C-alpha cells in the first residue's frame, strides 16, 4: 500500500499495460491496431499514435513480465524521487523516442513491426542513472553489485554493438532511443544534478562511441 501511494503512476502503467496486452492476445485486431508498423506510420494512413500505443502491447507473456517487473522495481523508487508527472514524461518520451529510432532505422522496411515498453523502461533506467550514478545495483546475471553508471555503460555499448546486426528480434535501436531520451529529459529537469554527475554521463556516452567504433571498424 505504501508503494502504491508513493508511486501511483508506476502502478497505473503496469496495470494498464498488463491489461491491454492480455486483451490483445485474445483479440488480434486490437493487437494489430496498437503495434508500431512502419507502413501504417509513414504510409498514407499516417497513424503516428502507434509510436506511443506500441508500448501497451507485447510479443508474449515473458516479454510482458520482464518489462513490467523491471519497470515496477525501478519505478516505485524512482517515481517517488522525481514526482509522478516527471516520471510520466520520462516514460512517455522514452516510448516515443524508441519508436522514432525504430522508424529511422527501418524506414525502408515497410513491413517492420515492433511492440513492447522496453524503450520506456530504458528511459527510466537512463534517467535514474543520470540522477544516481553511484547507486549500487546487483543484477541477476552478475554475482556482485556494480555502480549504476557502469551498468549504463555496458548496456549502451551492448545495444550499440548489436543494433544493426539483425541477429535477434530485439529492438536495440529503440532501447538506445529510449535511454538517451530519458537521460536528456532528466538532465533538463535537474541540470545541476546532471552537471555534478557529468563524468558518469560522459562515460556512458563514451561507451556508446566505443561500441559504434568497434562495430564500424572491426575486422570482418
Regions picked out by a protein language model, each given a short descriptive name:
Residues 1-220:
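A detector for small-residue-rich transmembrane helices and their helix-helix packing motifs
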Amino acid at each position: 500500500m505504501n508503494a502504491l501511494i508513493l508511486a501511483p503512476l508506476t502502478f497505473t502503467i503496469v496495470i494498464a499495460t498488463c491489461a491491454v496486452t492480455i486483451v490483445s492476445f485474445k483479440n488480434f485486431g486490437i493487437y494489430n491496431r496498437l503495434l508500431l508498423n512502419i507502413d501504417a506510420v509513414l504510409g498514407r494512413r499516417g497513424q503516428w499514435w502507434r509510436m506511443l500505443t506500441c508500448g501497451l502491447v507485447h510479443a508474449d507473456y515473458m516479454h510482458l513480465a520482464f518489462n513490467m517487473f523491471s519497470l515496477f522495481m525501478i519505478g516505485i523508487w524512482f517515481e517517488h524521487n522525481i514526482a509522478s508527472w516527471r516520471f510520466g514524461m520520462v516514460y512517455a518520451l522514452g516510448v516515443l523516442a524508441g519508436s522514432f529510432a525504430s522508424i529511422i532505422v527501418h524506414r525502408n522496411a515497410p513491413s517492420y513491426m515492433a511492440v513492447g515498453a522496453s524503450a520506456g523502461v530504458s528511459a527510466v533506467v537512463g534517467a535514474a542513472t543520470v540522477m544516481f550514478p553511484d547507486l549500487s545495483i546487483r543484477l541477476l546475471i552478475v554475482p556482485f553489485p556494480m555502480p549504476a553508471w557502469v551498468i549504463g555503460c555496458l548496456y549502451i555499448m551492448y545495444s550499440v554493438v548489436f543494433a544493426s546486426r539483425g541477429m535477434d528480434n530485439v529492438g536495440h535501436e529503440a532501447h538506445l532511443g529510449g535511454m538517451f531520451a530519458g537521460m536528456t529529459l532528466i538532465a533538463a529537469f535537474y541540470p545541476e544534478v546532471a552537471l555534478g554527475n557529468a563524468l558518469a554521463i560522459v562515460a556512458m556516452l563514451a561507451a556508446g562511441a566505443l561500441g559504434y567504433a568497434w562495430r564500424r571498424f572491426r575486422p570482418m
